[in-house]
C-alpha cells in the first residue's frame, strides 16, 4: 500500500515527531511505500511557549521527503497537497492535536483528497488542553471531511463524536498509544546503576521521575507540593524527584511552588528539552514515573514508562485510567491533591512494589505495540473500520 504521513518531522522535535518516526519505521518494515510530508515551520517564534522547536533528533529517524507546510501560509497548504497528490497514495495519515493547525490541515485534506486518497487522522486529543479561540469550529473544519480516525483513548473517541457531528462511529478505530522505546537500535540497555552514574544521580536513593513538557495542565505544581511529605518520610538522602522537561509558558508558578515546598535537597530540576537519545537513561535511572496531570485525554509518557518496565503514579483523569491498572501497573490518585501523590509514592516504596509492578508492566506492554497501530491503519486505508 502507498501511504503518506503528514506532520512535523526532523529537524523538529517532540513527541509528535517521535511518534510519526516510529510509525514510519514500522510501516516501512511491513513493506509499505511511504512518503512523509513534513513541516517547513511549526509555530511562530513570537507565540512558541518553549525554548526550542528544532534540534538534535535520534540518528535513526528519517528525514521528510518534502517539508513545505507552514500553518499560517495558505500557499504552503496548496504546495503540500500537490506533493501528496503527486505521490498518489492510497491513504494519507495525519496527526491532529491542536486547533492552531486546523485551517491548514482542513485545506490540505480537501485538496489532497482530489487525487482519490483516503484521509486518516490519528487523534492525540480532539479538545485542546488549553483554551483556544474558535476551537470547536476549527476542529470541525479539520476533521469533518476525513475518511477514518484512530482514537487513542475512549475519551478521545467520545470527544470526537461530540465535537464533530455526523462522524460515523464505525469509521473510528480504537488503538492506544504504542510504547516509546528510545533506545539506539543495536545498543544494549544500561542497568539502573549505569544510568544513574551517567546522569550523576545517587546510586541508592528512591527516585521518581516527571518527564515531558512542563505545561499548566500537567500539574507539576501539585507534584512539587508533595515534596514536603516525601522529605519528611525519607529525609534528604533517601528520595529524589527528578523533573526533566522544557517549561511552556510562564515559569512563575513553578518557581513559587519550589519556594513554598522548600525541598531543594530532594529535587533535581533539569529544565530544557531532552534529546531522544537521552530519554532512555532518565527512565532507566528512575524507580517509577509520576503523572500529576490536572486533565488529560491520554499520554505518551505512560508508554515511555512501560517500554522500560517502570510503573507509574498517575492522576485518574481523562483516558489515563484506561492504561494504568490501579494497584497492578501503578497507582491512580485524585487530581490536584499533593498529599495523595505523596502517599502513593510512599506506598510504592514502603510496600516494595517495584518488582511485582515491573512484571505486570512487562506483561501489559504487549497491548501497546506499533504493529497493532499499523494493522489498524491498514484496515482504515482500504476502507475497513474497527
Regions found by a protein language model. Give the residues of each.
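Nucleotide-activated donor-binding/catalytic signature segment of Leloir-type glycosyltransferases, i.e.
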Residues: 254-281
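A short, well-ordered alpha-helix in the C-terminal region of glycosyltransferases
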Residues: 194-197, 353-367
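Conserved acidic donor-binding segment of nucleotide-sugar-dependent glycosyltransferases
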Residues: 326-327, 331-338, 346-352
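Conserved donor-binding/catalytic core segment of Leloir-type glycosyltransferases
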Residues: 202-218, 224-227, 241-242
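N-terminal strand-loop element at the rim of the active site
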Residues: 7-13, 17, 24-86, 100, ...
